Amino acid sequence: MAIEYTGSLQGKVRAHTPETLAATWLNAYVVLPNAGGAPKVGTVEEFKGETKAYPAVVFCHGSSGVNPQIKIFAQWLADALRVAVVVPDSMQTEDRLTYSSPVPAADYEIIHKMRSQELALAMIEIKHAPWFDGRAIIAGTSEGGVTAARYQA
């Protein structure tokens, strides 16, 4: 039985450069709990001076990027669980390969390789974040769920 691939691919960039990979971390969406108030929202760069440390959820977004639903969920997690939430932003790469499903498995694997690199970098870099207390879990949704599930420390 032949599979009909009715999805489509957009974008030309199929591999990270050191600069595009770094941008996924530096521009990550970060939410920190805030006792008595709304969670604090910013980027890794904006929280360089933060002094209070928290356990963290490193959350891998789906193929739609850091969309409004991801932001709401991250803020809820930070507030409800009193954890830092960091969402590396893979959409920082201009003209990055994206898709609408279904496409051949080889095309998904190109994207999964990029996403795996982003998560690996995040797990290295988070150790240097002043708001990180050394405890982390990894989670994700959809395309990001595959990234989280495949992660090997």
Tell what function each PLM region has.
Residues A2-H16:
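Catalytic-loop region of hydrolases
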Residues E4, S8, F59, I137, ...:
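Generic detector of intrinsically disordered, low-complexity, polar/charged segments
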Residues A23-W131:
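Serine-hydrolase catalytic machinery in alpha/beta-hydrolase-like enzymes
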Residues I124-A153:
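Primarily recognizes the serine-hydrolase "nucleophile elbow" in alpha/beta-hydrolase
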